[in-house]
Amino acid sequence: MRGLLTVPAPAQAAAGAGAFDPDRGWRLHAQVAVRPEPFGALLYHFGTRKLSFLKNRTILAVVRSLADHPDVRSACRAAGVDDSEHAPYLHALSVLAGSHMLVPQEADQ
């Protein structure tokens, strides 16, 4: 399977308390804009000036619904991603969290 996300600049993995945990709730950072495209979407973070590409509409559906679910796996299931297919989605979401596109649901806005 091809990757689900393209990040132009190297994204560093989140560390410490901010490390990506798919068993907790996540949401888009308040400074991130989503622009749907035929291939998926563009994400732009106005604070860091980073641009990320979501390579299909399924990952876009997951990202958009994160705030509506108690954890990442629930958001994946709601978007129609089978449990056996979660790995590439979790990886893409981890990269987005590492680049501060996603933040924990309980994080300050």
Curated annotation (Swiss-Prot):
Organism annotation: Mycobacterium ulcerans (strain Agy99)
Function of the molecule: Peptide chaperone involved in the biosynthesis of the enzyme cofactor mycofactocin (MFT). Binds MftA and MftC with high affinity, and is essential for MftC activity on MftA, likely via the formation of a ternary complex.
Assembly notes: Interacts with MftA and MftC.
Encoding gene, per UniProt annotation: mftB
Top-level taxonomic group: Bacteria
Name by which UniProt lists this protein: Peptide chaperone MftB
Family: Belongs to the peptide chaperone MftB family.
Entry-linked InterPro entries: MftB
